[in-house]
Every structure is written in C-alpha cells, then in structure tokens.
Amino acid sequence: MRVRYEDEAIVVVDKPFGLPSQAPRGGGANLFDQVRAIWPKAALLHRLDTVASGLVLFAIDPRVNAALTEAFRSHAVHRTYRAVVVGTGLGAEVWDVEVQGKAARTQVESLGTGRGCTAVRLLPHTGRKHQLRIHAAMAGFPMCGDRRYGGEAARRWPRLALHASRLGFVHPVSAEPTTVESPLPDDLVELWQSVMGS
C-alpha cells in the first residue's frame, strides 16, 4: 500500500493487485484493515476488484463521511482507469449497456494499439460491480488477464490489466477541486509499453 494523498480529512492510497479492498469471507489480509491500522477512524467509501490495482479514497475524519458518500452516490467523484484490452479497432466511444439489470455507462478512449491489443482510458459514469470488465467483454474487447469475463484469449496474461489511475473530486473540507494520480504499477508497465510502442 502506497499513500498518494493525505490530509486531516482524507487519505488516498494505491491498492496493489491481489489485495482485497475489504476483508473476504473467512478473513485474511485486506486494504481496509491496513488503512485502519494507521488511521483507526477510516471509512471505506468505494472498492476496487481484488484483481485490479490503483487508487482508493478513504475518509479518516468521520465528519466528512456523509459528504463523500453522497459524492460517490451522485457520481461527483470522477474516476479514470487505464486498461489493456484484447483486440484492435476500438476508437472513442461510449459503452451504454445494463450491468446486472441496472443502467451502466462507460466512456472509452483508445490510446494506442500493438501486438493485437489496445491501451485504453476508461471513464465510468456509473459504478456497477465489475462494470468496466463486463462492458469491455460485451463490446468484444475483453481485458487482458480477465479470467472471469475474458475467455481464452484474455487468459494468457498473469494479471488483470486494469488500474485506477486518477480520482477527481471536490475536497469535503476546503471545497477545492482535488485530483490524485497513480502511475502504472511495475507489473503493468511492460505490457502497456509493448502496446504503446515505447
């Protein structure tokens, strides 16, 4: 876990691949417990899939919990992800397909192609469980390493190529626009560079 932003009210940390956001059934290591060990009043406001990596925002002052919970509920927290998907020919588009019977919308931007894959930026407008992975698979561009939704073509990569790279929100105390960014982790850099050609 690496801290990307911290003040008296909130903390934003990088969740590594393979670590659950909160305790799984039966217990075990998880991000929430690690954060609570340092900030005992921390509140988990959203989650990332265990097999994804990237930024997670916590309230560490209970007085801002309600404001941040409402910001997530009303989609006022802007999340940006970077991913690598199987296939080429993807441009700038919007995936607007229900997920588990609920409206779900994801904005997609192609950043480069190579080796039969495409590097993309994803901006979810809703926050359904596994939304980005399901949308990518339904569009015919499963995420590299997605063993649940990706099929055989996606399984040859050792991890899911999905990273929560940016959070933008209005700070609950200062009311200032706040942006926190996270670089790709080392285990995704090589794949990303092979697709982007750099």
Where in this protein do the model-derived segments appear?
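RNA pseudouridine synthases
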Residues: 1-198
